[in-house]
């Protein structure tokens, strides 16, 4: 999330200048050398495997004057026949010159044969009688035999020893030899200009304060131990993806004056049994040698999953061995003081309970998505090195990015810089940031995607329906922008609602209004064209989810009552899950209640669009002409929002310059009335409509009861 990076230090190097490492030969060179040695060894074996004939045939060849020369050795008689003489042995396959040069014994000439010697004192006389040239050859000594057999193996073992020495020094194959050693990177004595500090972490004030206390404990332990306090053994960072858990750990590495070991949870798991536990032991051994220090395990759920879940039947899960060793190292008989374990995960629900108990992870710090102030601080951090135009309003950008995590804000800021560079601007303007946010939220704009006029008209009325319902119901968030320009994978248009403030609670009326806003597109198509299309698929999915949550999770149904079927141990952190704890009759009742809520919302939307049909037509025509409308342009067509508060507080700038730039600068207040979630201003018409909807809902329930 920041441009700074951490560089592992080498604590074993005390020289002022780092020596240049020796060049490492590729592993293929060693393979070639081994192959050559094996070839030489085979040559020794093949050198003695010449063509052999019986001794009687040898004497016959002498008497028939077919022998040219003879070399007599103690172990063999080597005979050279005259050219053209057939030895009676089968022909050999032809070899090439390279083979004969590399392996001279691989192929014996056709006129050379061997004979096993026998005790024959008349052999020399027979050779002299027939004029055969002969000579003696001394036999091989035991030393030469020893060299012939031992030297190749000595060369092989020497090469083997050399390669494994290279492996131990970090050469080729070192990973195989060091498979039981941990892969943690050590950060120590980091450079002032490259390290990440707590100043680079924004929007995480509470989490940062908790972690800073741990760092301060390591720097000045007496400050805390004087009253009997103990050093915490573990800190678990929990939060959705992209919120800055790893960045917070990098800041700890940059701020702490103690060694910092960093490793990923997946680095403990290998294909070999016992490697994970060995790496855990080696990691804590090194950490204890450098205590006090910090160990950071990123994505600890890769190794810390609950035991017994996901294990193969009939086998021992390697992850369990690794986890058991981790539990022992964190709080077992052989634990030492001075080693703090930090870990990060976005799946705390799958972690083993023994890992989460106090004494191992004493603190669980929630790293959540930033609020309005946190988003503004995060924008400030990620734009501090950018050239910004004076019209850039970071507070307005923060208000336009509700629910953004730190990584998404960093991505939006980077996209804005790229857009400004693509447009050849000298600085990044507010328009660039708004386009970048829109690109992150809705996807890449597809200007070249051709839509036929009929479908374009359907999309225009669909988005206009969303906008009018959201605009006329003050419980909904204000409509910031409407577009019928295709974006992303499949979106043909979208309506962007921007909340005026961060909300943590929603009332039943607000959820009902949100369902109405989502139904606005489908009902508008039905009212104008007399038929519906597939464009409302995503809207219907959201409507179904909200309605079922109202009935099953939040207890907002009179028939179901104050019951919740919420399942906290869901497989995906942060997403509500539902576990079936009811029978078929209750399931039927739930479905009826959900359908009643959605049908009541649909009737409310039909009445509203019928009342504002002229505004629907005007908004759709303007969309077909301009393809994109901002807040001020929408306000010109639909008028002031009923019960809206942003106009009264001066939070919307509808000046001519702002309208020309196509942007609206929302600057919502960070404080809100404590009762704002319960009391919402309603017009008489809206109140009557909601009361009528409630009456229809009650009537439908009475009918179902009967």
UniProtKB/Swiss-Prot annotation:
TM segment ranges: 25-45, 143-163
Side Cytoplasmic, residues: 1-24, 164-706
One Pfam family recorded for the sequence: FtsH_ext
Entry EC number(s): 3.4.24.-
Molecular-function annotations in GO: ATP binding; ATP hydrolysis activity; ATP-dependent peptidase activity; metalloendopeptidase activity; zinc ion binding
EC supergroup of this enzyme: hydrolase
Residues where ATP binds: 239-246
Binding-site residues for Zn(2+), renumbered to this chain: 462, 466, 539
GO terms for cellular component: plasma membrane
Classification via InterPro entries: AAA+_ATPase, AAA_lid_3, ATP-dep_Zn_Metalloprotease, ATPase_AAA_core, ATPase_AAA_CS, FtsH, P-loop_NTPase, Pept_M41_FtsH_extracell
Cofactor(s) annotated in UniProt: Zn(2+)
SUPFAM superfamilies for the chain: FtsH protease domain-like, P-loop containing nucleoside triphosphate hydrolases
GO biological process: protein catabolic process; proteolysis
UniProt subunit comment: Homohexamer.
Listed NCBIfam families: FtsH_fam
Full protein name: ATP-dependent zinc metalloprotease FtsH
Native source species: Chlorobium luteolum (strain DSM 273 / BCRC 81028 / 2530)
